[in-house]
């Protein structure tokens, strides 16, 4: 699997990412670090303990990382959840959260598949 194929699989914008990072080796380094980002874990923690502020900050960070890496599908889904939580008045909408979780899992799965294909 190529990095471009990985991006296609997750609904990302490979060309925008290359424009931002200037070359594939730099982009690859950051893509491979993405699964270790703690934003999704912190989002779940915030939900579990009922801390809407933590949930908001976590999904906002996830949205930003996804945007910087041009993971378009994940960024859009995280953005919708971010806006729902922005005013910190309610727990995350279950459908929005599910969409973020599915996109996140697909993204991490594709990155793992890409990494395995390089070994």
Segments from the language model and where they lie:
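Alpha-helix N-cap/helix-start motif at coil-to-helix transitions, marked by capping-box chemistry
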Residues: 8, 32-34, 72-75
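Short, well-ordered alpha-helical segments
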Residues: 39, 51, 55-58, 66-86, ...
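Long, amphipathic alpha-helical coiled-coil segments characteristic
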Residues: 11-61, 92-115
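Intrinsically disordered or compositionally simple regulatory linkers and C-terminal tails
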Residues: 1-5
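Conserved catalytic segment of histidine kinase HATPase_c domains, centered on the N-box/ATP-lid region
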Residues: 87-91
